[in-house]
């Protein structure tokens, strides 16, 4: 006797359906428990950040550079790609040359993306150059710490000033 297709589908997927119902039910139970059992304090200090018993000073909003966000995104992207390469390396015997060629193309696309990121400066952490021109440094003579050299430099400087004043 052959089972109908709906019975086969139910028999095949019942465990996954029970898992989904259990996960959604557990999330709902935790949310309802927090709603009914949670405190309801409505004071002025409720919306003030708590800092280890110390009154906070200044703004709690700290500006982060977008570079940190970019690095996090690059990490996630390249980490997922490493996961794909790991899965490919496990099934390399079954995939054969076609799988190898696909992996090489995948790696080349990764390298092209990395090259593009380097080219646009997304991975460059040095500050950008300003367009200001730096003036040519003037010649400054530094006196040495030896007393004999200091007296010689003073006498040379004094004679130069005397010559300029004439």
From Swiss-Prot:
Subcellular localization, per the record? Answer: Cell inner membrane
Protein origin, superkingdom? Bacteria
Reactions catalysed, as given in the entry: a quinone + NADH + 5 H(+)(in) = a quinol + NAD(+) + 4 H(+)(out)
Q: Tell me what topology the record assigns in the membrane.
A: Multi-pass membrane protein
Give the E.C. number(s).
Answer: 7.1.1.-
Subunit info here reads: NDH-1 is composed of 13 different subunits. Subunits NuoA, H, J, K, L, M, N constitute the membrane sector of the complex.
- Protein name, per record: NADH-quinone oxidoreductase subunit A
Q: Which organism is it from?
A: Yersinia pseudotuberculosis serotype IB (strain PB1/+)
